[in-house]
UniProtKB/Swiss-Prot annotation:
The keyword Cell cycle does not apply. It comes from Methanosarcina barkeri (strain Fusaro / DSM 804). This is Probable cobyric acid synthase. PROSITE patterns: GATASE_COBBQ. Coiled coil: none annotated. Gene3D superfamilies: 3.40.50.880, P-loop containing nucleotide triphosphate hydrolases. It comes from the Archaea. Pathway: Cofactor biosynthesis; adenosylcobalamin biosynthesis. GO terms for biological process: cobalamin biosynthetic process. Catalyzes amidations at positions B, D, E, and G on adenosylcobyrinic A,C-diamide. NH(2) groups are provided by glutamine, and one molecule of ATP is hydrogenolyzed for each amidation. The gene is cobQ.
Length: 485
């Protein structure tokens, strides 16, 4: 590839590739026109571009860090797991097909053509392309059909930087082993290592760094400290980490961890003021201060699982007592009925919802609504009435049409008579400070606590914070030399 570029690969999933790319995009954007690129992403969390295309949320974040508008070319192939070894394929931001892994691999040649076109368009509009691999780079069973690691490396011939995670142990073996297993034509382009999530005394680590460099002939560009990010998470591994985190806040919000959960980043903004507890269907719901039902890749099947587990009855028992929010698929579940023509579950049928909202949803065709929106709050009740008439922003990613006689955000959403059960199709709802503060004000006052609205860190501040950490701990002179600037 003639354009300046760099490919960030990893030894495994969740080693920090996306964060490193975000930081690099921010750093380079100070002097160059930069674009992120990930040929193929598998993610439960997605983002809608201004022109209504769906991409992985990580690439949207990276683009914004680079100061450029997110586009479908930055993530030409998005795989959204639906369960039962089937994923929905999003091609250049549009729904393409639902396929098993085996069937998907049969169309790799077609996918390659798509990503090559996307990459060419990005190169025409930007000075530097910062590319990201997926999972572990050394998946030797997938080399011949891997488009995101080996495929991208071979297509672009870009210099490669390999990221390893020291937090989970075995980082030296992971880095050395990954390099050893890479095909020779790819291995020769590995120009540096980054060790991520380090806690402790760097002096103790240095002998290992030296031996790694001697054994591989590849320099360690830097050791990045463990750092709590203030940007949205990408995948379900992040969700596991959240569940392990300690949170001593006095307000507890239970998020139902649906088997096919999607866009759980919707609730991350609430972590600043409340303890967010992800509850499995077979777990005790406890006595939360509020309940959230998130989006899902299959509303019907998750609704059936919710009922079979007994969790549906537990949620229904809280009606009128605490706030219950449903977003996207969770909103659909809150209604009285869901009619499926076969789009969701393969057969035509009508299902009874939770009955907490006076709405009904119909899945009539394989068609997804993807759009960024600005809405005006028009609602009553103890939570939303204080912000009646104010604007909020969000984005929609859903199939199905819902009929509601009590819209609360323009022509979207619904609310019960008490104003405590609230449903909406808007992802990013709690990114709106007025919505977030309205909910927290209600929850804090109900417990006799004083709510002090947080001073929200802006997106730009978060990107700068991350970029500064990376810049301070990376050999930037060597990095610039590697990418040729």
């Amino acid at each position: 590839m003639e354009k300046k570029s760099v490919l960030i690969l990893g030894t495994a999933s969740h080693v920090g590739k996306s964060s490193v790319v975000t930081a690099i995009c921010r750093i380079l954007s100070r002097e160059y026109r930069v674009a992120p690129f990930k040929a193929q992403n598998m993610s439960l969390n997605s983002w809608i571009t201004k022109d209504g295309k769906e991409i992985g949320i990580a690439q949207a974040i990276q683009a914004k860090a680079a100061g450029t508008e997110p586009t479908a070319d930055m993530n030409p192939v998005l795989l959204k797991p639906k369960g039962d070894c089937v994923s929905q394929i999003i091609l250049l931001g549009e729904p393409y097909a639902d396929r098993s892994a085996g069937k998907y691999y049969e169309s790799i040649a077609e996918m390659n053509e798509v990503l090559e076109g996307a990459l060419k368009r990005l190169c025409n509009e930007h000075d530097i392309i910062v590319m990201e691999g997926a999972g572990g780079a050394a998946e030797i069973n997938l080399y011949e059909r891997d488009i995101v690691n080996i495929g991208t490396a071979r297509l672009t011939q870009a210099p490669i930087i390999l990221v390893g995670d020291i937090e989970r142990g075995g980082v030296f073996a992971s880095l050395y082993g990954t390099v050893a297993l890479l095909p020779e034509d790819v291995r020769k382009n590995v120009k540096g290592f980054i060790i991520n999530k380090f806690r402790g005394d760097l002096e103790i680590l240095k002998p290992g760094l030296k031996q790694l460099e001697e054994k591989t002939g590849i320099p360690v560009l830097g050791v990045l400290p463990y750092f709590k990010l203030n940007i949205p998470s990408e995948d379900s591994v992040s969700l596991e980490d959240k569940e392990a985190e300690k949170n001593e806040k006095e307000i507890e919000i239970a998020v139902i961890r649906l088997p096919r959960i999607s866009n759980f980043t919707d609730f991350e903004p609430l972590e600043r003021s409340a303890k967010i507890r992800y509850v499995e269907l077979d777990e005790d719901l406890g006595t939360p201060d509020a309940i959230m039902i998130p989006g899902t890749k299959n509303t019907v099947n998750d609704l059936l699982d919710l009922k079979a587990s007994g969790m549906a009855e537990k949620i229904q028992a809280f009606k009128g007592k605490i706030p219950i929010f449903g977003i996207c698929g969770g909103y659909q579940m809150l209604g009285k009925t869901i009619y499926d023509s076969g789009v969701e579950n393969g057969v035509e049928a009508e299902f009874e919802g939770l009955g907490l909202l006076d709405i009904g949803t119909k899945f009539g065709e394989y068609k997804k609504r993807t759009i960024q929106v600005t809405k005006k709050v028009s609602a009553y009740g103890p939570i939303l009435a204080p912000i009646d008439g104010e604007e909020i922003k969000g984005y929609e990613i859903h199939m199905g049409i819902t009929d509601s006689c009590r819209n609360i955000f323009g022509n979207d959403g619904a609310i019960d008579k008490a104003g405590l059960v609230i449903g909406t199709y808007l992802h990013g709802l709690f990114d709106n400070k007025n919505i977030r503060d309205a909910l927290m004000q209600y929850l804090y006052e109900k417990k006799g606590l004083e709510y002090i609205p947080e001073n929200s860190m802006t997106e730009s501040d978060a990107y700068e914070e991350l970029a500064n950490v990376v810049e301070q701990n990376l050999d930037m002179e060597k990095f610039y030399e590697i990418i040729g600037i």
